């Protein structure tokens, strides 16, 4: 009986030793410390830190940009649009003899502020038709960058400058319907009982900037900006004629307030 008790005690001691050895690694006494390094770019908020993969490759940036625009098409049914155009470096030459000539050409070149609330289902074309149906491609752009900013990713894409943009081709046609081509300017001149023998337009500083959520990659806001420099020769304004008129329209368009279904 005594021998049996001794055997049992010995087994318990041996088992305890095995358990202690097995637990050494868990207590950190024998297992070396491991270091985990993340290669992802981090975007942080004041309360939490989120790991977000910020694309660096141009193709991947454009892909994320297109996905954000598609999000609006699929999930949103309301949004707000603000358009602002200011005219600078206006030179109306001899037409300054007319007291309202400056205001007339600011109007012709599109100066003003416009705010609109859209029901997407009723006004789908305003947003959807402003961009290529198959999405943007890297070859359309001169540059594409992405960076982390608080709880969002800021994607900026830039386009090449162009001369005499039109409604069918070119950089401006890719990003908005809210620009003026020579035909639009010609019509505006007619509305003011005016005309020009030649109209030249140069578009430049063409840029789109999207704020994309780090949570679901939805589009939070979209800003479009560009400049158009107008040079009109042989201008007739009512009874005044023969002057050259030039000016720059600085256009900014903001889409925001997207409401999802």
Model segments located where?
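Subset-of-secretome marker
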Residues: 27-261
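C-terminal motif of bacterial Sec signal peptides marking the signal peptidase cleavage site
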Residues: 19-23
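Bacterial N-terminal signal peptides that target proteins for export
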Residues: 1-9
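Repetitive helical segments and hydrophobic/amphipathic motifs
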Residues: 12-16
